[in-house]
């Protein structure tokens, strides 16, 4: 069974074609700058990579490129389903869902909760249904994994009517990644997932930690939106809610302007004085003595360690810490500094193992006798493909 996985953003589409029976990715790619005349798709088959223009710079044009590539591979008729990443499923979805009119209506109803993401997801689904209309389409939600959080973790201390009438609560994100790496960590540790208490740290341009108890999320750092929690590439993470009114009064900024700044001009970029959000560049600049870069890296580690410790409190007992995402998988510096701060929880670093766990090399990075810390490569496309297959198997009884 070949499964096409799509992740539609406001100006991009990330795609992958997976053969689950052979555990292979046959095709992957990224269509960028959609909505402009310079839209281009980068296609990768193994080590071969090439770029092609996207007709009219639209989702439909991007999917025409994908269809053509499937034809060139001779596998168009073997594709059995399309799996879509959808950022926000609200309280409605605690599992992936076969997309029909009711599911689409429910995704639309979540737009106020994710105005930066769900509209693009919806537009991408609609264009994909036009391009691949004969295939079943499945929505896999970033928020679904965290629907097992107890109310003490997901409720905000705000008027009850805000929750009852408007759904104001903590939802969490990166759920597909947290669930995948938790299962992989259990496999690598040689222990059953349902017997483990894990903290998973997804560290990329967006960052979050989660407390995973027996394979179920019981807390996470992101909240109503992906803005809450850790310091991220351009997102602030936790700030005083009074900041909006303060900046409106002091600088004449609107709510929209403050929110945009917190999402796009803050985090590592803001702390470094606008140097950038790429951790590799910030680490290098910090090594050269750049004051802003040093502050950004140190604050990132400090807030990450506090986040991990908070998740450990939720678990009561911590069996292992998992690093994943672009930073988590590749920055030995960030991992080492974080574990040094977490010595109070029993972590000790194996410096050689940590140095080797880069560029796609997963493994244990903690010293003997330490609480285990390990690097696990996330694979959200594979997870979405597997969940898509599970939905179809439940619908048809087909285990292929």
From Swiss-Prot:
Location(s), subcellular: Cytoplasm
UniProt-listed Pfam families: Acetate_kinase (PF00871)
Cofactor-binding details, from the entry: Mg(2+). Can also accept Mn(2+).
Cofactor(s) annotated in UniProt: Mg(2+); Mn(2+)
Enzyme active site: 142 (proton donor/acceptor)
Pathway: Metabolic intermediate biosynthesis; acetyl-CoA biosynthesis; acetyl-CoA from acetate: step 1/2
Record site: Transition state stabilizer: 174, 235
Domain of life, source organism: Bacteria
CDD domains: ASKHA_NBD_AcK_PK (cd24010)
Coiled coil: none
Catalysed reactions, semicolon-separated: acetate + ATP = acetyl phosphate + ADP
Protein name: Acetate kinase
Organism placement in taxonomy: Bacteria, Thermotogati, Deinococcota, Deinococci, Deinococcales
This protein's encoding gene: ackA
């Amino acid at each position: 069974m070949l499964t096409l996985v799509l992740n539609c953003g406001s100006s991009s589409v990330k795609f992958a074609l997976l053969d689950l029976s052979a555990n292979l990715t046959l095709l992957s790619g990224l269509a960028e700058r959609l909505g402009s005349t310079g839209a281009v798709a980068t296609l990768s088959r193994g080590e071969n990579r090439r770029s092609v223009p996207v007709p009219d710079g639209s989702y439909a044009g991007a999917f025409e490129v994908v269809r053509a590539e499937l034809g060139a591979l001779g596998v168009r008729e073997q594709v059995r389903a399309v799996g879509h990443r959808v950022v926000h499923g609200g309280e409605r979805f605690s599992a992936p869902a076969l997309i029909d009119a009711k599911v689409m209506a429910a995704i639309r109803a979540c737009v106020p909760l994710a105005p930066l993401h769900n509209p693009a997801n919806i537009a991408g689904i609609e264009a994909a249904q036009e391009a691949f209309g004969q295939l079943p389409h499945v929505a896999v939600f970033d928020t679904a994994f965290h629907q097992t959080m107890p109310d003490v973790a997901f409720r905000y201390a705000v008027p009850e009517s805000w929750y009852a009438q408007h759904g104001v609560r903590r939802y969490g994100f990166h759920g597909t990644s947290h669930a995948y790496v938790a299962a992989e960590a259990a496999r690598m540790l040689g222990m059953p997932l349902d017997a483990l208490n894990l903290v998973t740290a997804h560290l990329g341009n967006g960052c979050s930690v989660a407390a995973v108890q027996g394979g179920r999320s019981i807390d996470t750092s992101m909240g109503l939106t992906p803005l809450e929690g850790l310091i991220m590439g351009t997102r602030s993470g936790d700030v005083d809610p009074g900041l909006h009114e303060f900046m409106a009064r002091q600088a004449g900024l609107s709510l929209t302007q403050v929110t945009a700044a917190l999402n796009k001009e803050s985090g590592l970029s803001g702390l470094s004085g606008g140097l950038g959000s790429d951790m590799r560049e910030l680490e290098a600049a910090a090594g050269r003595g750049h004051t802003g870069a040093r502050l950004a890296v140190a604050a990132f580690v400090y807030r990450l360690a506090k986040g991990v410790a908070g998740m450990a409190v939720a678990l009561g007992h911590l069996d292992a810490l998992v690093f994943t995402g672009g930073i988590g998988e590749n920055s030995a510096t960030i991992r080492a500094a974080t574990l040094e701060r977490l010595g109070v929880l029993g972590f000790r670093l194996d410096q050689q193992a940590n140095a080797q766990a880069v560029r796609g090399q997963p493994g244990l990075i903690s010293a003997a006798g330490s609480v285990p810390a390990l690097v696990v490569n996330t694979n959200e496309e594979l997870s979405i493909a597997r969940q898509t297959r599970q939905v179809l198997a439940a619908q048809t009884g087909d285990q292929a």
